[in-house]
Amino acid sequence: MSGKTVTRADLAESVFRKVGLSRTESAELVETVIDEICNAIVRGESVKLSSFATFQVRDKNERIGRNPKTGEEVPISPRRVMTFKASNVLKQRVLKAHLSRKSKLKPSNPAG
């Protein structure tokens, strides 16, 4: 893992370089896209970005949990949670990149 975190500013910079919008317009575009995704999720809609992922909101019912320290049963309130499900295309890209890095790190074993 590289440890790098991609930020909104990084996305805006990429739009600036690849699309040719001004830096301000690029930042506004990134903000607009993120706002639209967030608004749809808040409304309870699924957001499906083909070849990337699906974001969904799920309602979870009340259930009984357990305090790991004491073993005491504790009710867990009903709540809404957001899920992220990567597409198969994205999963394959991640796997391919992982295998490629792994093969580069493996030392060659010369016969002899």
Swiss-Prot record:
Pfam families in alphabetical order: Bac_DNA_binding
Key words, A-Z: DNA recombination, DNA-binding, Transcription, Transcription regulation, Translation regulation
Keyword RNA-binding carried by entry: no
Protein family per UniProt: Belongs to the bacterial histone-like protein family.
PANTHER family: DNA-BINDING PROTEIN HU, INTEGRATION HOST FACTOR SUBUNIT ALPHA
Quaternary data: Heterodimer of an alpha and a beta chain.
Protein name: Integration host factor subunit alpha
Record lineage: Bacteria, Pseudomonadati, Pseudomonadota, Alphaproteobacteria, Hyphomicrobiales
